[in-house]
Amino acid sequence: MSWVENMKNQENISRIVELIGQRAGNIFTARGYCCSETVIVVINQGFRGDLSPELAVRLGSGFCHGMGGAGCICGSLAGAEVALSLFLGPRQHGGMKSKEFEKVAKEMHDRFRARFSATCCRVLLKRRKEKNGATCKELTVGGAEIAAQLLLEQRPELAAKVDLEFLGARESKLGTLAKKLLGRE
């Protein structure tokens, strides 16, 4: 690959990661999903995964608020790990070998910690209350962005599968409420 092609590829990857983050922030706010639910939905739909949106949400529900309110691992990080597993996990066609995937999963953890200085929901929320930490929305955006970056580093061909229509769409709380009332969601 030439230097110019490499630069274009990097710009494309950066744009996809940015769109993933924006869509995660939008869905977190508009649909009222928790962090883990949002990350799984956005990565799955953004990269045209094979889970239905409903199943993607259900998979993330137990990780909300640091494992069901326990305050342990941040749901955004847990959701990102699940999302990476959907595309890279070893027990699927085309998945990575277990040891290779473990390195990617650890890298997700390490990048999240480097960006937000912690991985524990309780610690992250305490920092937020002290006014020097990220909001849950910011953690959700960050978790989705890091997962997308890692996914594209491992499987760059996924850039061609990205659902730009889904990633570019924007919803509002009012629109989401109207869909629920009309039975369209």
Feature-to-residue mapping (PLM):
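A short glycine/serine-rich beta->alpha loop
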Residues: Q22-A30, F63-G71, R127-N132
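C-terminal binding/interaction regions
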Residues: F101-L181
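Short alpha-helical scaffolding segments that buttress acidic/His motifs in well-ordered protein cores
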Residues: A24, V39, L59-C64, G143
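Active-site-proximal helix-loop elements at catalytic-domain edges
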Residues: I20-G49
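DPxDG-like acidic metal-binding loop motif
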Residues: A78-F87
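Polybasic, low-complexity association/targeting segments
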Residues: S2-R31
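Phosphate-handling active-site elements
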Residues: G46-R58, L86-K103
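Acidic-glycine-rich active-site phosphate/pyrophosphate-binding loop
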Residues: E5-I16, I43-G62, A114-C121
